[in-house]
């Protein structure tokens, strides 16, 4: 790992593989385990950078594919790079665009060279290769960048998944060659679908390349929750203990606890802001629909114990009114609360690991279904 990047494990759970640590980047530290809010188009929807900082967010994710389409990496560079362009001075990560491209199943063609697809914005034909993905990410300037990978769908047969996994490795080698900036850490991505032996082979092969960090991709794409848990539990321990481990696209309470127990450090997910835009609050493991009639005259805060701006200043009744009226402020307040909730959740897990009380305080999540909606 470059001298400007480092990962230090501070404590480990004595009964699981959970760990707490510090990931150092050029734009500051990330205390792990940590949830990362998603700012797809260089903004976390409905939330300003100042508000985002108050949630406790330390690292934010943006999307290479979407930023390439709009406004274009040249515009971002002209604005001083991604951090300055969006007004966020903390650590940042950009994904490679692979997941988004491969979700365009009817609009793209895969070859060894890369992926050709038709832009959903204007119909323009775009070619994205490992080299082009890295070039765009180098221009954007995030602290952590991701290798361009092929994300197989679920379900997919073994032959298809094996071919995608092997291509992902070859593309990673090309990404490493193309990568030009020492102030950016390139993470590799372990694919392999639901086939644990393919996951193990990919993890062992990737770790030989001694990258600054590693991610588990291709999960939360439609497979049953218990299958995702098996993938993470089998794969995470195979990744180097002295490097950060990132589980892509995961952000529910139970999923994060299972992953942390397996040794995962970082998470990202659009759930807190997406649910907010549907009038849903995340509260201590539950999902509350603020449209429900019972909240219309409920003048308590969403969560009396939450320090966020929404809970310190507004009632459930008021936010319910905003949701019913489709006021933008509703989405802002719920996004602030939901992001704060997930970050506080991972902070509490971190503290429990430091005191070796992880299993005592969070073990019930490992054996139970997601809590029912209130």
UniProtKB/Swiss-Prot annotation:
It catalyses: 7-aminomethyl-7-carbaguanine + guanosine(34) in tRNA = 7-aminomethyl-7-carbaguanosine(34) in tRNA + guanine. Keywords: Glycosyltransferase, Metal-binding, Queuosine biosynthesis, Transferase, tRNA processing, Zinc. Its EC number is 2.4.2.29. One of its GO terms (molecular function) is tRNA-guanosine(34) queuine transglycosylase activity. Zn(2+) binds at residues 306, 308, 311, 337. Substrate binds at residues 95-99, 149, 191, 218. The keyword Secreted does not apply. Residues 249-255, 273-277 are annotated as: RNA binding. The active site is at 95 (proton acceptor), 268 (nucleophile). Its cofactor is Zn(2+). Gene3D superfamilies: Queuine tRNA-ribosyltransferase-like. GO terms for biological process: queuosine biosynthetic process; tRNA wobble guanine modification; tRNA-guanine transglycosylation. GO terms for cellular component: cytosol. It comes from the Bacteria. SUPFAM superfamilies: tRNA-guanine transglycosylase (SSF51713). It is an enzyme of class 2 (transferase). HAMAP family: Q_tRNA_Tgt. Homodimer. Within each dimer, one monomer is responsible for RNA recognition and catalysis, while the other monomer binds to the replacement base PreQ1. Catalyzes the base-exchange of a guanine (G) residue with the queuine precursor 7-aminomethyl-7-deazaguanine (PreQ1) at position 34 (anticodon wobble position) in tRNAs with GU(N) anticodons (tRNA-Asp, -Asn, -His and -Tyr). Catalysis occurs through a double-displacement mechanism. The nucleophile active site attacks the C1' of nucleotide 34 to detach the guanine base from the RNA, forming a covalent enzyme-RNA intermediate. The proton acceptor active site deprotonates the incoming PreQ1, allowing a nucleophilic attack on the C1' of the ribose to form the product. Belongs to the queuine tRNA-ribosyltransferase family. This is Queuine tRNA-ribosyltransferase. It comes from Nostoc sp. (strain PCC 7120 / SAG 25.82 / UTEX 2576). The lineage of its organism: Bacteria, Bacillati, Cyanobacteriota, Cyanophyceae, Nostocales.
